[in-house]
């Protein structure tokens, strides 16, 4: 508990003393999969962003499609922070209850957790004093640890003793973040 308080204090101290933007992804939000984040200055050309993407829904076929993605990311801006091109590197985590694309015509789905390591490229354009647009795309490698179930009975169907494992190279983030400067 003490460590959490110290980390929270340090984080909010940095945020309160630097340029900080809160963000929402216009594209994913229109698709009812909100992606929100916060980006703050940590150096002359460096920023740190933390964002969360969440799907709370089932698919249009009524199959499991819930997932949560948590991504902390370091960003290097080539021109100046919050203006122009940047590259980012991130490590993130996932929680999912999902039917993968190759199981669409079956009764199978997976529940699991995972981690990802990847990169982002983007361009930020200031549009008003406190607003900017952040155009970005990113992806990387996702390693998943899951258990397979039947949708109809919720019975476990895989043969793994503990968890199945899988890894994929995926584009898993992108869009247009509408950003508002807090200070």
Language-model segments: which ranges?
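Bacterial Sec-dependent N-terminal signal peptides
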Residues: 1-21, 178, 182
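Solvent-exposed loop/turn segments connecting transmembrane beta-strands
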Residues: 21-36, 59-66
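Short aromatic-enriched loop/helix-cap "lid" or pocket-rim segments at secondary-structure transitions
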Residues: 36, 100-101, 146-149
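Gram-negative (and chloroplast) outer-membrane scaffold detector with strong preference
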Residues: 40-135, 180-182
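Short alpha-helical hairpin
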Residues: 42-44, 151, 155
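Short, solvent-exposed beta-strand-terminating loops
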Residues: 137-150
């Amino acid at each position: 508990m003490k460590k959490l308080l110290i980390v929270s204090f340090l984080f909010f101290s940095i945020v309160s003393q630097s340029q900080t933007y809160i963000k929402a992804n216009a594209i994913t939000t229109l698709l009812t999969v909100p992606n929100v984040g916060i980006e703050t200055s940590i150096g002359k050309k460096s920023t740190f962003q933390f964002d969360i993407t969440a799907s709370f829904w089932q698919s249009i076929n009524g199959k499991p499609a819930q997932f949560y993605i948590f991504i902390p990311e370091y960003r290097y801006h080539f021109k100046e922070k919050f203006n122009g091109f940047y590259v980012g590197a991130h490590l993130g985590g996932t929680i999912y209850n999902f039917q993968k694309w190759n199981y669409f015509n079956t009764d199978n789905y997976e529940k699991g957790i995972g981690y990802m390591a990847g990169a982002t490229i983007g361009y930020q354009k200031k549009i008003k004093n406190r607003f900017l647009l952040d155009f970005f795309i990113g992806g990387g490698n996702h390693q998943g640890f899951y258990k397979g179930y039947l949708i109809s009975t919720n019975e476990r169907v895989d043969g793994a003793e503990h968890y199945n494992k899988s890894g994929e190279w995926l584009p898993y983030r992108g869009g247009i973040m509408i950003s508002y400067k807090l200070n």
